Amino acid sequence: MKIADLMTLLDHHVPFSTAESWDNVGLLIGDEDVEVTGVLTALDCTLEVVNEAIEKGYNTIISHHPLIFKGVTSLKANGYGLIIRKLIQHDINLIAMHTNLDVNPYGVNMMLAKAMGLKNISIINNQQDVYYKVQTYIPKDNVGPFKDKLSENGLAQEGNYEYCFFESEGRGQFKPVGEANPTIGQIDKIEYVDEVKIEFMIDAYQKSRAEQLIKQYHPYETPVFDFIEIKQTSLYGLGVMAEVDNQMTLEDFAADIKSKLNIPSVRFVGESNQKIKRIAIIGGSGIGYEYQAVQQGADVFVTGDIKHHDALDAKIHGVNLIDINHYSEYVMKEGLKTLLMNRFNTEKINIDVEASTINTDPFQYI
């Protein structure tokens, strides 16, 4: 398997297009044409993680947090530059799966919920997928070759199906005037043509390409075509809603997940004895969604990186919070390893995948 093949597999199951627009995901450092010798999953790509990959003989690291996030202005032998230089010197490929793994139905938030032992887990804050239904009108004799060209260029595909068109027949009319150069008809004379309306679906990113192809292969000088926007609730969303088997107090629940996640500290906002049943989770830094979570029926909102004033606001408004620290996302190391191994086993791909043993939490606890 080459890096390009691994990227295709990852994109199929955890699409990079579902990442936030500000994010930096995908192949950050590497060569798509090299063979994968092994994969190391990590929360952060630190120098220690790079050394671990080198020791194992693995040439691919998949990290959750992007090492390169903003524009790089220099690569010196210190700080982040040292990490990047070492990756390049040892021909190690670095792939980032950040917010695309956050919003995935099997991603970070699902991994956290399962690690906490929760039940009835479902995605919340679902994304909206944008599609377009394209329709254009073409003379009956040109239908076949026109559809062939669209299909050859990747349009009119639905999952594992290609050449997905709908046709309806009708009668078109037009009158060429002035300096027109009509394929059919004569200047200043109304022409009637048996036409077919062709309809097909495209993804949002294909819109400009579809317009280009229609203009290129349609027999008319000025073809008529429409893009009708369709929005559909996506399977992807930022966060999950889940439940404990039996009601428990806020303090007991906080202590329970501290133990199950094996993290050194947990903070919570709310009355210690308040009963908890439904839990909303956004791993990492999810403040800003806490009130929406309550509106969706959550008894407590679990996230990390909660600041003082956000916690105070929540307390004043009666919103229960639990801060499990940003590093709690470390569960993705084993979770992503499992996802990859399942796919590799299904497709009979013999490549080692290991979760990094390096703790990249920058904090020390006393």
From Swiss-Prot:
Coiled coil stretches, renumbered: none
GO cellular component term of the entry, any: cytoplasm
Keywords, sorted A to Z: Metal-binding, Zinc
Iron-sulfur recorded as keyword: no
Source organism superkingdom: Bacteria
GO MF entries: metal ion binding
Pfam families linked to this entry: DUF34_NIF3
Residues annotated to bind Zn(2+) 1: H64, D102, E329
Binding site for Zn(2+) 2: H65, H326, E329
InterPro entries found in the cross-reference section: DUF34/NIF3, DUF34/NIF3_bac, DUF34/NIF3_sf, N-reg_PII/ATP_PRibTrfase_C
Family: Belongs to the GTP cyclohydrolase I type 2/NIF3 family.
Assembly behavior: Homohexamer.
Protein known as: GTP cyclohydrolase 1 type 2 homolog
Originating species: Staphylococcus aureus (strain MSSA476)
